[in-house]
């Protein structure tokens, strides 16, 4: 999906849902212009989310639910389409399960979530003179850093998986020797006993000999 130059989401109090959805769009298109409002302009040309009853708005019936019963919010709806292109299908699913679903659940049901609470604290207090949009984009900047690290970590696992798969294919006598210490043992799924060796473990063995 090509990200357009303009995005529109709801104004007023913001939540982790619309904040992380905005962060995702900024990661994919850093120059995107996000506008907040209470009504989507009739002539708006761009992506609309968390408002407007479109593809990326969960405030409509019938609601969309995951197979495990967790309802989608805007962030989850966007990630379902855009996430696999960033980290691949498997890692996109894992990020959804472990990171996004708790945020979506909070937005839809009020289920307690510390990260959602932290993002919510960026909203100006009742007697503040701060501009609400400015506060929103401060929260987006923080969410963007968190999401960027999620994506970076997921792609690091993808790279490690490739290394381990290659090492497994080159294994001899049940010994898998990886060129570096990496988080990839979970890809060794064949029912074959494996002895893992890395440069670090080999060096440790030499020192103890």
Predicted regions and their residues:
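Short, glycine-biased loop/turn motifs at secondary-structure junctions and
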Residues: 62-63, 95-99, 153, 160-165, ...
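Hydrophobic, aromatic-enriched interface-forming segments
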Residues: 105-183
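Gly/His-enriched, cation/cofactor- and phosphate-binding structural elements
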Residues: 166-209
């Amino acid at each position: 999906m090509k990200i357009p130059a303009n995005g529109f989401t709801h104004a007023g109090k913001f939540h982790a849902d619309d904040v992380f959805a905005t962060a995702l769009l900024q990661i994919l298109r850093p120059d995107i212009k996000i506008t907040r409002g209470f009504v989507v302009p009739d002539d708006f040309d761009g992506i609309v989310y968390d408002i407007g009853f479109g593809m990326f708005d969960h405030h409509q019936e019938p609601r969309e639910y995951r197979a495990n019963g967790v309802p989608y919010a805007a962030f989850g709806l966007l990630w379902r389409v855009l996430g696999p292109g960033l980290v691949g299908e498997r890692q996109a699913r894992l990020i959804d399960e472990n990171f996004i679903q708790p945020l979506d659940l909070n937005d839809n049901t009020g289920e307690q979530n510390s990260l959602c609470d932290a993002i919510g604290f960026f909203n100006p207090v009742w007697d503040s003179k701060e501009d609400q949009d400015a506060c929103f984009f401060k929260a987006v900047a923080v969410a963007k850093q968190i999401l960027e690290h999620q994506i970076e970590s997921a792609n690091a696992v993808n790279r490690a998986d490739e290394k381990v798969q290659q090492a497994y294919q080159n294994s001899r006598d049940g010994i898998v020797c990886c060129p570096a210490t990496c988080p990839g043992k979970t890809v060794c799924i064949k029912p074959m006993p494996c002895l893992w060796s890395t440069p670090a473990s080999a060096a440790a063995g030499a020192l103890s000999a």
